[in-house]
């Protein structure tokens, strides 16, 4: 009975501790504005606009870059106070690799709200070439946007969150971080490097209560992806792509945003240092069971 009582008491302590931890997670690092604050570093393409809408519906204030047409007004109508940091573009040359770019976004969050709770960054530059045709110039461009920009983002996001003692970061990379495409040798190389960088950053930040994860997408249903592979004008290429995906279809951006939101909503505070592919099962394709 003593053992059972001890286990019960231990369980009660753990339950109380978990409840206290959850309550703590839902507080905000922001000192102004009365709401939790999220940074969406690229609200123009891919996941970003969808994630920003989800944050607004969760009663967050927002700091965003390069918003899609009409997005800022939409977020405000949903009740968010929105700061748009100017000077960023997604239609090459991308701006995230500029020294100090990510820091400007963080500074905007600190100036307006006195802190932030969640940060998402998408950095991307597709260079199409295999190992026999890639150039030093193409490799360097890919390094700047797909790897160096991730370092700058993490170096900007982490210090204020670590000082506050709580927060979450998601870096969008690519499913090719784990399963390469030989026709995108530079892209895959530096996406893989970025995924490892995120895992290293997570270990650095974990003792301070910060969660850092990478989400790697592929086969997303947006024009840029289809154009890169020539599938926007060639139905046969699109069909060939679909045949590579176990789920047999392209992924929707809002599906990926939903997954990212679960890593950034202030409640999932025991998941860190991971690379999550969001690619319809592609990363496990070929791993057949008997």
Residue ranges and their predicted role:
Residues 25-63:
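Canonical Rossmann dinucleotide-binding motif of NAD(H)/NADP(H)-dependent dehydrogenases/reductases
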Residues 90-103, 111, 118, 124-140, ...:
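Conserved mid-core segment of classical short-chain dehydrogenase/reductases
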Residues 125, 132-151, 170, 194, ...:
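Catalytic Tyr-X3-Lys loop
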Residues 154-155, 199:
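A short, exposed helix-loop element centered on a Lys and neighboring polar residues
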Residues 159, 203-204, 269:
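Alpha-helical segment proximal to the catalytic Tyr-Lys
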Residues 168-193, 198-207, 219-220:
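Catalytic loop of short-chain dehydrogenase/reductase
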Residues 206, 211, 271-273:
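Short, small/polar-rich loop/turn modules that mediate ligand/substrate recognition or access, typified
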Residues 272-290:
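Short C-terminal tail/terminal secondary-structure segment
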């Amino acid at each position: 009975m003593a053992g059972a009582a001890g286990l019960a008491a231990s369980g009660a302590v753990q339950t109380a501790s978990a409840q206290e931890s959850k309550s703590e997670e839902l507080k905000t690092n922001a000192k102004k504005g009365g709401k939790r604050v999220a940074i969406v570093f690229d609200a123009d393409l891919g996941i970003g606009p969808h994630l920003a809408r989800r944050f607004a519906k969760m009663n967050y204030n927002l700091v965003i870059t390069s918003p899609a047409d009409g997005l800022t007004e939409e977020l405000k109508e949903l009740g968010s106070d929105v700061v748009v940091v100017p000077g960023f573009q997604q239609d090459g040359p991308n701006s995230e690799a500029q020294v100090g770019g990510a820091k400007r976004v963080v500074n905007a969050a600190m100036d307006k709200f006195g802190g932030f709770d969640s940060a998402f960054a998408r950095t991307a530059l597709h260079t199409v070439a295999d190992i026999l045709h890639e150039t030093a110039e193409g490799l360097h461009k890919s390094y700047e946007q797909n790897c160096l920009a991730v370092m700058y983002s993490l170096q900007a996001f982490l210090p204020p969150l670590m000082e506050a003692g709580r927060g979450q970061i998601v870096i969008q990379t690519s499913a090719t971080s784990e399963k390469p495409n030989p026709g995108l040798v530079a892209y895959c190389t530096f996406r893989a490097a970025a995924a490892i960088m995120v895992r290293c950053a997570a270990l650095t930040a974990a003792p301070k209560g910060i969660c850092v994860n990478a989400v790697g997408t592929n086969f997303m249903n947006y024009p840029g992806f289809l154009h890169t592979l020539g599938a926007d004008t060639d139905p046969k290429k699109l069909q060939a792509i679909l045949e590579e995906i176990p789920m047999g279809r392209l992924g929707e951006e809002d599906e990926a945003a939903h997954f990212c939101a679960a890593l950034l909503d202030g409640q999932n505070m025991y998941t860190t240092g991971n690379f999550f592919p969001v690619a319809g099962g592609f990363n496990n394709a070929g791993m057949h069971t008997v």
